[in-house]
Every structure is written in C-alpha cells, then in structure tokens.
Amino acid sequence: MRCRDQALASALGEEGKGLVFVADPDVSDRWQDVRAELHEAFALTKQAAIEGEPVVYIVRGDDLLGRNGIGAAMAATALLSGARTASLEAKESAINVLAIEEQSGPGAVAAWAWHLLNSEGPRGELVRLGGSHLGKALP
C-alpha cells in the first residue's frame, strides 16, 4: 500500500491481497514530481502484476476533471489510462481506479478499495464515490 493520508491508511490497514496506491493530492505541477509519482505507481504495479495481485489506484475525482492543478490532473488521468492499458496486458490482475470526493469518508473509501481488490468484477474501470462529477465532461 502507498498512502500518505493517515486516516485513510489506518482505515485501509495492511491486511489483504493486492496493491492500493493512493495518488498524492499534493503533487506539484513540476514535471519531475509528476514523473516520480507515476514511476512509483508503475514500479509497484509491475510487481503486483508479476505476482498476479489486483491493484486499485485511488485518485480525487476533481483531479480527473482538472480542478486541483495541472500536476494532480496529469497524475490522476495517467493512472486512469495506465489502469485501462495494464488491464489489457495483465490478464491475471484486476486493475481499477477509485475516484473519491473531499467528503468521502476513510471507511467508505477503504470498503470500496477492498471490494475491488477482492472481487472477480471489473477490470480497467473507474468507480466514482459521490456525485460531484454529474453534469461534467468526463474522461
């Protein structure tokens, strides 16, 4: 697990299979910082895929809409694209994205993350918590 939010990390715990990668909401607009974020996600995802483990990327829904800065938008949309592409290549691993809102509680986020990690459900999909995306142009 890679999570810098203490409350969410506590809710997620360390148990269970797979990788939960929580995008850094404070990633700067500097390309080097975005690249470092994506490099870390790639390295961890590659290891999970080799082991046949599922992956969930957690991003802020507003980052997918470009509302919180260029760096956060680049990282979130790249993770979404990466999840979709990796799902085509890593057929043994479910790789999905969970988009959360400011008011998404850590318990709800953790429950959805663990559901995606432990189900035979979607692959390469975006699951949104909340409704702030409704009525917007979506990626």
Regions found by a protein language model. Name each.
Residues 101-103, 132-133:
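A short, acidic, flexible beta-alpha connecting loop/helix-capping segment that sits on the rim
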Residues 1-102, 108-119:
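Rossmann-like short-chain dehydrogenase/reductase
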